[in-house]
Structures are given as structure tokens and as C-alpha cells.
């Protein structure tokens, strides 16, 4: 029998200390990784529920196990809320991750060795959009498109590549692109060559849910997303469609289960249901509007301090800063900012002279800082501190600048906690 006083702290102090240290790190560091966010206590409560014990292979009303009556309620709630949130006709809430959602889409609609046309990882795409090191680049014949020297998608180049390689599927979406994607243009190109248009909106799903970034649902045959990132829910995946093709919906359904996954994670689906309810609240739209405002405010500071911002700005939650002109590496910038309790990630920039593990840039995102309450004035000050640190790399005053910046970071983090006590 389990008792109420059982706890990790007494049973496994080494693990407990790691958990406590991570709690402290999140509270005392400013999180600027574009793919990270903070889940609400309600979401975390659902993840820690007794649904973690339940096997529920199948779908609501069609399970292979008994005792699923409450799991059915949870999953149907998540499905219905996601449909309302995104304007979808079809939703599958079972994918364990965005990558598994993407794998299910490929498996449903195309065959091994079919050609896919996706965005180059080095130009802002994702591993699962056809990178050679990914299953998507090994199982399928992957052709890649990129961005111009100005940091924008060249739709005519996409069209020409599509005409040349005749893909069965065009993959749109990104992990490091700061502008608006013309979903209608991508569908036009897909229709011209008879391809499916598959959109991975993982990075901008929260913005789309709030109506501050254009939705791909009216144009794509199928859309996937993660449920964390801008959406701010648990770590997981989601498949959606509004194409109206019941045959596609059936293929997607069977591609998730039984083709790619067994039992769904019902506790995570419960957390997704909470997340979708939160995203339907009026204040969620204000939050997402502020995410974009904060990103734009930071961009202006970096530009004023003579740092190059790829595409010269942002229309979403993220932007890339290039250090090619400064001769600085993304790895060095990442490390220096980390010493000051500012967390970013090194990122390749277009035509990057450095290797992918070194890079010449960093990616900055505002979902997490905005969620903990940072306003435009706060992120402008933060961007200035970051530039101070970057300017000092290799100079005699570097350690002093790091110490001064860290003190400022700790002060604002104390004033704007992630989880108020």
C-alpha cells in the first residue's frame, strides 16, 4: 500500500537534489530558448495524476482495455477543445511528441523512398523535415529548400525545386524562422505538382491559437504541433486537419495507433486538455500578443547595438542574431550569457562558416520570459545586458560585466518569479 507520506526527498535524496536544483535554476535564470516555456501548475497537476497508471490502447469508445470510461472523457475533452481552439475537423491528441506526430503523418500519406520537399535544417527547418540524420531523410528521398541572404523564404525557388523533384509531400514550418510563412503560396505550389501540403506549426501554435499569426489550417492537408513551446502545455504532440477528406483522417488515425504507437499517455492527454482550456481564455490572447511585442522590442535593441538580426526583424516569438561580422561564435556567446544566468541556444545562421556544433549565431525567443511577466521595458533592458556581455567577450572587463549582469538577472528574477510562492 502507498502512504501519503511517501516522498522522493527521503527515498532518493540524490534525485531530489537534482529536482530542487532545476527548480532553482528555472527561477534564477532568464529563459530565452525559443522552444521552451513554463507549464502552469494546473497542467503539471494533470501530468502527476493517477491517469499515469492507465493503459488505454485505442480511441474513445473503442478501447482494447477495460476501465477506460474516464480516460475516454479526458481524451474527448482534449480533442473537442483542440478542434475549437484551432478550427479543426480532425484532431489526434495521442502523439507522444512532435517528431512522432510528424512520423505518423509521413507514414499515413506517403511511402518509403517517396520524395519530400522540406526546409533545410541549416536555414531554419527541423530535423524531421528531411534532414539526412533524421528518419525523415533516411526513409524518404529528401530535397531541401532554404532562405535568401535576406533571411526570407524564396517561394519561386521552392516552386522550381518542386517542379524539378515532383515531391509527394511539401513540408512547411520551421524551428528558426522569424517571419510570416505564406501558407496559401505553399499550398498553391503543392497543388501545382500534385503534392500534399504538410505544415509543422510547432513553434507558432500558441500564436496561431491566439490569432496573432496566420493559421495554416485552411491551406494544409494536415498540420502537426507540439503542445509545449508557445502553446505552453505539457511536452507532447498533436495532429490536426481541416481538409475535409475523411480518407486522410482515417489514415492519420491508424498511423498513430496502431502503426506508430501503442498505449497513449493519458496523464499527458489530461494535461493537454488543461492547456487547451487555458488557451481558450481571453487573457491567453493578450499573453501571445505580448510574446510578439517583446520579441520585436528585443530585436530593436540588438540592431541599435550593431548586431545583425537575420531577416532584419521578427513577426513571431523568435529571432536569430548573427555574429559573423564580429567574428564571434554562437558557442562562445551561449556560454558567456549562461555565466550571467541568461539561457539561449547557439544556432546556425544562413551560409554559416562554422560547424553546426559551434555556429555563428544564437536563437532568442520570448514565450517563457513573457509568461513570467516581463514587459517591453524589461526585455529591452535585458537585451541591453546581453549586448554588454557579448561586447565584453575577449576583453579585460569580461568577468566584471558577467558579475554585474548576473546580479541584475537575479534581481529581476526575484521580482518576477515563475511560480509565485
Curated annotation (Swiss-Prot):
Pathway(s): One-carbon metabolism; tetrahydrofolate interconversion; Amino-acid biosynthesis; glycine biosynthesis; glycine from L-serine: step 1/1
N6-(pyridoxal phosphate)lysine found at: 229
Reactions catalysed: (6R)-5,10-methylene-5,6,7,8-tetrahydrofolate + glycine + H2O = (6S)-5,6,7,8-tetrahydrofolate + L-serine
Physiological role: Catalyzes the reversible interconversion of serine and glycine with tetrahydrofolate (THF) serving as the one-carbon carrier. This reaction serves as the major source of one-carbon groups required for the biosynthesis of purines, thymidylate, methionine, and other important biomolecules. Also exhibits THF-independent aldolase activity toward beta-hydroxyamino acids, producing glycine and aldehydes, via a retro-aldol mechanism.
GO MF entries: glycine hydroxymethyltransferase activity; pyridoxal phosphate binding
Required cofactor(s): pyridoxal 5'-phosphate
Transmembrane segments: none
Main EC class the enzyme belongs to: transferase
Quaternary structure and partners: Homodimer.
Database matches in Gene3D superfamilies: Aspartate Aminotransferase, domain 1, Type I PLP-dependent aspartate aminotransferase-like (Major domain)
PANTHER family in the record: SERINE HYDROXYMETHYLTRANSFERASE
Amino-acid positions noted as binding (6S)-5,6,7,8-tetrahydrofolate in the UniProt annotation, renumbered to this chain: 121, 125-127
Protein keywords: Amino-acid biosynthesis, Cytoplasm, One-carbon metabolism, Pyridoxal phosphate, Transferase
Subcellular location: Cytoplasm
NCBIfam families: PRK00011.1 (NF000586)
Pfam families: SHMT
Cellular component GO terms held in the UniProt record: cytosol
Family assignment from sequence similarity: Belongs to the SHMT family.
Protein name: Serine hydroxymethyltransferase
Alphabetized SUPFAM superfamilies for the sequence: PLP-dependent transferases
EC number per UniProt: 2.1.2.1
Site (Plays an important role in substrate specificity): 228
CDD domains named in the record: SHMT (cd00378)
GO BP term, pick one: glycine biosynthetic process from serine
Amino acid at each position: 500500500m502507498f502512504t501519503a507520506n511517501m516522498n522522493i526527498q527521503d527515498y532518493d535524496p540524490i534525485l531530489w537534489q537534482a529536482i530542487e536544483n532545476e527548480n532553482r535554476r528555472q527561477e534564477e535564470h532568464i529563459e530565452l530558448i525559443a522552444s521552451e516555456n513554463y507549464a502552469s501548475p494546473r497542467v503539471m497537476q494533470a501530468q502527476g495524476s493517477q491517469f499515469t497508471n492507465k493503459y488505454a490502447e485505442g480511441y474513445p469508445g473503442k478501447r482494447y482495455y477495460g476501465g477506460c470510461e474516464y480516460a475516454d472523457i479526458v481524451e474527448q475533452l482534449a480533442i473537442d477543445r483542440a478542434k475549437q481552439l484551432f478550427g479543426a475537423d480532425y484532431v489526434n491528441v495521442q502523439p507522444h511528441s512532435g517528431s512522432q506526430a510528424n512520423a505518423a503523418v509521413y507514414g499515413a500519406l506517403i511511402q518509403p523512398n517517396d520524395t519530400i520537399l522540406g526546409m533545410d535544417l541549416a536555414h531554419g527547418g527541423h530535423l524531421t523535415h528531411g534532414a539526412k540524420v533524421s528518419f525523415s531523410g533516411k526513409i524518404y528521398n529528401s530535397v531541401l529548400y532554404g532562405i535568401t541572404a535576406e533571411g526570407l523564404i524564396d517561394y519561386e525557388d521552392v516552386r522550381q525545386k518542386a517542379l524539378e523533384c515532383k515531391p509527394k509531400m511539401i513540408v512547411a514550418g520551421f524551428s528558426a524562422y522569424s517571419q510570416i510563412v505564406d501558407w496559401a503560396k505553399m499550398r498553391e505550389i503543392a497543388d501545382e505538382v500534385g503534392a500534399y501540403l504538410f505544415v509543422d506549426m510547432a513553434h507558432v501554435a500558441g500564436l496561431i491559437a491566439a490569432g496573432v499569426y496566420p493559421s495554416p489550417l485552411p491551406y494544409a492537408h494536415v498540420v502537426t504541433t507540439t503542445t509545449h513551446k508557445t502553446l505552453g502545455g505539457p511536452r507532447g504532440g498533436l495532429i490536426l486537419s481541416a481538409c475535409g477528406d475523411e480518407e486522410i483522417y482515417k489514415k492519420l488515425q491508424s498511423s498513430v495507433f496502431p502503426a506508430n504507437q501503442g498505449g497513449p499517455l493519458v496523464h499527458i492527454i489530461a494535461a493537454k486538455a488543461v492547456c487547451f482550456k487555458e488557451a481558450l481564455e481571453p487573457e491567453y490572447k493578450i499573453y501571445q500578443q505580448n510574446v510578439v511585442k517583446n520579441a520585436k522590442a528585443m530585436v530593436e535593441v540588438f540592431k541599435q547595438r550593431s548586431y545583425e538580426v537575420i531577416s532584419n526583424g521578427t513577426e513571431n516569438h523568435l529571432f536569430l542574431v548573427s555574429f559573423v561580422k564580429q567574428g564571434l561564435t554562437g558557442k562562445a556567446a551561449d556560454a558567456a550569457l549562461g555565466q550571467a544566468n541568461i539561457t539561449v541556444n547557439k544556432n546556425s545562421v544562413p551560409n554559416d562558416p562554422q560547424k553546426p556544433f559551434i555556429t555563428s549565431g544564437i536563437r532568442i525567443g520570448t514565450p517563457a520570459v513573457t509568461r513570467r511577466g516581463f514587459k517591453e521595458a524589461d526585455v529591452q533592458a535585458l537585451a541591453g545586458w546581453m549586448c554588454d556581455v557579448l561586447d565584453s567577450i575577449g576583453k579585460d572587463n569580461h568577468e566584471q560585466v558577467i558579475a554585474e549582469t548576473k546580479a541584475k538577472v537575479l534581481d529581476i528574477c526575484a521580482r518576477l518569479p515563475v511560480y509565485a510562492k
